[in-house]
């Protein structure tokens, strides 16, 4: 759904009003900020020039949505803990791993894989919130201070996540823009227009329909009134 940071910002802006209202009214949480982590990309041992090359490969994933995406490409998704990714790759239990571009480099995946595909399969998002009752008991001036400063912190985190995504790619491939002492020699394979079309097709035919099957509420209507409207992707409502 979000092939770049600009798309992710648009998606969050479309869904955030519902999310914040639901957190307050249903869960008693006052949402204060939303953070993002660097893009989740593909580290592979074998050459990877297009998404179709993932067919038949065993690929580490960290979410159900990622697993649906991999299965649609003909790959086998495997749930493996983050710290165990290198050993599984070295032992031949997995062929590729989907993880953060920055955290993957920190973990040393540039030492056990040779090919890097920078397509953001997913992004990690986190919410910073407070118990609503406790929040309302805070002094008004403190709430005003937090309400003013936390959005600034949020924006700095988003900017850092975009920078860290680029740094992870640069350092794993040994590009000149890398600012870290550890540099890899991975081959970077850019996203093609063919893969952009395939990404959208899988989202519409596999990832979204499976998500809709798992959802316990009328998610089609929610999707259509938020993300679907913003991104031009309507789902059939029940």
Where are the regions that the model predicts?
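A gly/proline- and charged-residue-enriched helix-loop-helix capping module
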Residues: 2-23
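N-terminal secretory/targeting leader peptides
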Residues: 1-5, 24-238
């Amino acid at each position: 759904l979000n092939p770049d940071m600009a798309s992710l910002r648009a998606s969050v802006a479309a869904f955030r009003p519902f999310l914040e209202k639901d957190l307050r009214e249903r869960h008693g949480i006052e949402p204060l900020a939303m953070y993002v982590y660097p893009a989740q990309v593909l580290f592979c041992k074998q050459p990877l020039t297009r998404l179709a090359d993932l067919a038949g490969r065993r690929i580490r994933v960290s979410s159900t949505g990622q697993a649906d995406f991999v299965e649609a490409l003909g790959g086998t998704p495997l749930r493996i803990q983050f710290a165990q990714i290198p050993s599984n790759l070295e032992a031949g239990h997995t062929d590729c791993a989907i993880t953060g571009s920055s955290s993957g480099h920190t973990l040393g995946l540039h030492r056990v894989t040779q090919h890097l595909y920078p397509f953001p399969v997913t992004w990690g998002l986190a919410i910073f919130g407070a118990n609503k009752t406790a929040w309302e008991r805070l002094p008004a001036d403190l709430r005003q201070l937090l309400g003013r400063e936390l959005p600034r912190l949020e924006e700095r985190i988003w900017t850092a996540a975009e920078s860290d995504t680029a740094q992870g790619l640069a350092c794993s491939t040994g590009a000149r823009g890398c600012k870290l002492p550890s540099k890899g020699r991975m081959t970077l394979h850019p996203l093609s227009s063919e893969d952009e079309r395939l990404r959208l097709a899988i989202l519409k035919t596999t990832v979204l329909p499976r998500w809709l099957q798992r959802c316990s509420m009328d998610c089609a209507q929610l999707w259509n009134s938020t993300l679907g409207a913003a991104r031009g992707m309507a789902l059939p409502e029940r």
